[in-house]
């Protein structure tokens, strides 16, 4: 994650969260966040300013921060439950619904990534991450180094 962070927005996720007990999931989330802080890994932290942002934005972003790392359950299977079709995993002990907030943080992260925070995420990539990458590459080519790559030039 530390090597990716200068290039992309990092949002921590725990996949297959349905394989963990609630206690194991809470402990895993705590340990992941402790490691992120200990190793100073920059992650997208759903920023807000209490003085400038409206109450809804502050509340939503605080809630999203509290969910990190997101516990995700995925499935391609469609199961009918109570007359409605849902994406879920069927187990001998029951069903885990992908879109049920009690089972997974999928709805929260989907909403954040594709709706409420999409513009902010794109802006950070374009204005900050890409520009840093571009500056790094241009400065390497100016001082003659290629960052470990051999460059071939074709003379026309």
Language-model features: locations:
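Conserved GTP-binding G-domain of TRAFAC-class P-loop NTPases and closely related GTPase folds
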Residues: 6-156
């Amino acid at each position: 994650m530390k090597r990716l962070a200068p290039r992309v927005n990092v949002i921590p996720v725990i996949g297959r969260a349905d394989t963990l007990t609630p206690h194991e999931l809470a402990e895993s989330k705590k340990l992941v966040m402790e490691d992120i802080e200990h190793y100073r890994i920059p992650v997208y932290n759903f920023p807000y300013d209490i003085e400038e942002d409206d109450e809804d934005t502050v509340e939503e972003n605080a809630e999203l921060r509290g969910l990190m790392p997101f516990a995700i359950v995925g499935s391609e299977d469609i199961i009918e439950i109570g007359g409605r079709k849902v994406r879920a995993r069927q187990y001998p002990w029951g069903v885990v619904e992908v879109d049920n907030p009690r089972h997974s943080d999928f709805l929260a992260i989907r909403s954040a990534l594709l709706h409420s925070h999409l513009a902010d995420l794109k802006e950070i990539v374009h204005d900050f991450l890409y520009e840093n990458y571009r500056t790094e590459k241009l400065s390497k080519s100016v001082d003659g180094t290629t960052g470990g790559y051999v460059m071939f030039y074709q003379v026309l």
